[in-house]
Amino acid sequence: MSIDSDVDPSEVSTAKRKPSRSWLLIDAAGNSTMLNVDSYAIIRRVHIYARDLRVFESSISSPLSIRTREGAIVLNLEHIKVIITADEVLLREPLNENVIPVAKEFERRLGVENRERRGQPDGKEDSGAEVDAEKDESPFEFRALEVALEAICSFLAARTTELEKSGYPALNELASKISNRNFGKVHKLKISMLTVRVQKVKDELQLWLEDDDDLGDLCLSRKIATTSSPVSDSDEQINSYPTSPTIGAKISRAKSHLVRSATVRGDDQNDVEEVEMLLEAHYMQIDRTLNKLAELREYLDDTEDYINFQLASSRNKLIEFEVIITAGSVCISVYSLVVGILSTNIPFSWNTKEHMFKWVVSATATLCAIFFVIIISYARYKKLVGN
């Protein structure tokens, strides 16, 4: 995951044409300086590739990532775009409304911990409290990485809390009364979009936790300390002999293995464990946020099932009503047909018989009523109505 300090000229020329960007430089003492420089100046300062800065461009849809280089950690965590070295932090777009709190947190945390490491007071009198004797000896890059991860995890947790506060009442209103207004409230929740954002952070942290060698690449201070190790002397002796390209590649891989082996012994292993605990803590935090979103999604699915059940029940009632109306219409049509026939002004022998018309009409009405009861009874028997 490391690169040489040399910069590719083609990438430099590409970066040089880019306009200047605002950066906030925060050193190990917590002092901040606003920089307005182009990408080439940043590349020369921290020795990274131009493609590492392209992921910061808002016009490019780049995935969330944590990258390590020879002397820098490049973080692209949504709106938090930061480059961390062993002694300074470069924060992109510090005037963004979402980045301003992060910049202040960097200044506060790094400045406070620097004063604690020196045993200096904060400038404010504590109520009889003394500075702990056991100071935080974590490397600068670990403390800066902790601030960045805590910022993105807290940001997503806050968005999740806001979604819960608006989501559960909206779902309850929709369950109690199905309407376009309540449905519009639920449609604006955007649970899936936030879940994808949280899942990306979790996947990135999980990817780093799966390999201890990758965790060792985050120890920038140890990398700098090992540059003057005895391994460098052996490298000079090896490089003094001419080698073929194939043998040179093998020697290069062997040297990389030696350097990697030297950085995971002794105190380096402690640094690996420390950064692993750091990532695990934020992994658990982002996992809790993802669980909250999963619970909200499950509640949404349950509400959707309940609404579908209510709609199906209403649809069944309409079908039952339609069956009853159809049966009644058939019976009334038969009755109207008989009455219409008897009402025609045609000479007929029954016209001379008194009360014959009333008997026929009454009998027809009775038969139609019996026919209607038979239809409804059959529909109930077939469980078409009355369920």
Swiss-Prot record:
Keywords from the UniProt entry: Ion transport, Magnesium, Membrane, Transmembrane, Transmembrane helix, Transport
Q: Which InterPro entries match?
A: MRS2-like
What is the membrane topology noted in the UniProt record heading this document? Multi-pass membrane protein
GO cellular component terms, A-Z: membrane
The compartments listed are: Membrane
Transmembrane residue ranges? 323-343, 359-379
State the family it belongs to. Belongs to the CorA metal ion transporter (MIT) (TC 1.A.35.5) family.
Give the protein's function. Answer: Putative magnesium transporter.
| Name of the protein described by the UniProt record | Putative magnesium transporter MRS2-9
Source organism of the structure: Arabidopsis thaliana (Mouse-ear cress)
